[in-house]
């Protein structure tokens, strides 16, 4: 997750996204029900809750459609039997993952701004300002800073399971399979499209209207 000798893109894409993920739990389907004193309290307006549920509902629907690749291959002869991710079971962790990546991207951008002597870098958190700061990252080994961020994020979820365990996890684990903690999240982040030039027709393309942003 973290290497003190690694460059910023790698660490923000690794431990940065994990820290952001944990912060995000304070505002997920469960954490959002508690106030600043840790008391169970509906501190949101009805409109806030309605909008939150609409966005989380869209994320649940996305994840309900996912089948782990290894299980899709296992059930290739009868795809209707292939087990899917449970979007409702995993929604809290998916909110954490999505928020964590967006938080880490902003933090990385602000770090780049400060390194360039822009003391007011954190004053403008607009998408355009964040993208402009990220574009100042030096290229390394043929990859931009933004690309290295996403490559690092993907690398922290590398895993391999037996088919039986993969199926069991779908039933009991509130975390999504690793491939969807990466690809499922990245497909909802506009900066991922900028990083790798993802366009309509590519496997990870989601139309802008279908991309979910909780926060």
Which sequence ranges carry the predicted segments?
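Zinc-dependent metallohydrolase catalytic domains
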Residues: 1-16, 26-215
């Amino acid at each position: 997750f973290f290497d003190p000798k690694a460059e910023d893109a790698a660490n923000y894409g690794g431990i940065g996204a994990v820290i952001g993920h944990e912060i995000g739990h304070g505002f997920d389907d469960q954490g959002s029900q508690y106030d600043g004193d840790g008391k169970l309290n509906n501190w949101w307006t009805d409109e806030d809750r309605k909008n939150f549920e609409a966005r989380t509902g869209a994320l649940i629907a996305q994840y309900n459609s996912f089948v782990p690749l290894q299980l899709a291959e296992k059930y290739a002869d009868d795809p209707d039997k292939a087990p899917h991710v449970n979007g409702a079971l995993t929604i809290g962790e998916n909110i954490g993952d999505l928020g964590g990546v967006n938080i880490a991207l902003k933090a990385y951008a602000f770090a780049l701004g400060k390194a360039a002597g822009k003391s007011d870098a954190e004053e403008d958190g607009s998408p355009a300002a964040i993208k402009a700061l990220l574009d100042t990252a030096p290229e390394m080994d043929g990859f931009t800073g933004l690309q290295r961020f996403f490559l690092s994020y993907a690398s922290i979820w590398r895993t391999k399971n037996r088919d039986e365990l993969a199926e069991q996890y779908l039933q009991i684990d509130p975390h999504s399979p690793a491939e969807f903690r990466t690809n499922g999240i990245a497909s909802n982040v506009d900066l991922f499209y900028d990083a790798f030039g993802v366009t309509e027709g590519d496997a990870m393309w989601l139309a802008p209207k279908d991309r979910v942003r909780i926060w």
